Amino acid sequence: MSIKSDKWIRRMAEQHGMIEPFEPGQVREADGRKIVSYGTSSYGYDIRCADEFKIFTNINSTIVDPKNFDEKSFVDFKGDVCIIPPNSFALARTMEYFRIPRSVLTICLGKSTYARCGIIVNVTPFEPEWEGYVTLEFSNTTPLPAKIYAGEGCAQVLFFESDEICETSYADRGGKYQGQHGVTLPKT
């Protein structure tokens, strides 16, 4: 299994729609101001956060149960900047829609710009033949409110191609997050 280069990422995005919308280079400025970079890097793709958020709240004092998650634990927010309360988290989604080839698995890592501020981005791997918008989780590990910027980079996706095709892909299994749109809450 080897990591894929910028050339491969560009080819797969442009010829096979692997990433839409796709930025073939690195974008570091918008409207004359510096932003958290996004687009193609040497061996990965820096994804952007869309402007749809679900901010975790303790208003209802419920127990967090991944098998029976209460949607009322979130406040919906739409905007260019999301403020995450201290020691809390928010869910968001990518601006990009992904179509992962059958021979590929991705690993997604948070950008250091956020990590150095105590904001951790968590995303599970994109499995072979998974497609959809990626649900992102931003954890604010600090005792202060933290900002997340929509339309800017937040994490980097690394693409690994296997030496042989998997026997059963995510699509073959009928994965529960296949084709997701919007911010998707836990499913069992």
Swiss-Prot record:
Source taxon at top rank: Bacteria
Catalytic activity: dCTP + H2O + H(+) = dUTP + NH4(+)
Pathway membership: Pyrimidine metabolism; dUMP biosynthesis; dUMP from dCTP (dUTP route): step 1/2
Active site annotation, chain numbering: 137 (proton donor/acceptor)
Single GO MF annotation: nucleotide binding
Record's keyword terms, sorted: Hydrolase, Nucleotide metabolism, Nucleotide-binding
Gene Ontology biological-process annotations: dUMP biosynthetic process; dUTP biosynthetic process; nucleobase-containing small molecule interconversion
EC number per UniProt: 3.5.4.13
CDD domains per record: trimeric_dUTPase (cd07557)
Binding-site residues, dCTP: 111-116, 135-137, 156, 170, 180
Entry function: Catalyzes the deamination of dCTP to dUTP.
Similarity annotation: Belongs to the dCTP deaminase family.
HAMAP family (UniProt xref): dCTP_deaminase
Complex and partners: Homotrimer.
NCBIfam families, per the entry: dCTP_deam (TIGR02274)
Protein name: dCTP deaminase
Species for this entry: Cupriavidus taiwanensis (strain DSM 17343 / BCRC 17206 / CCUG 44338 / CIP 107171 / LMG 19424 / R1)
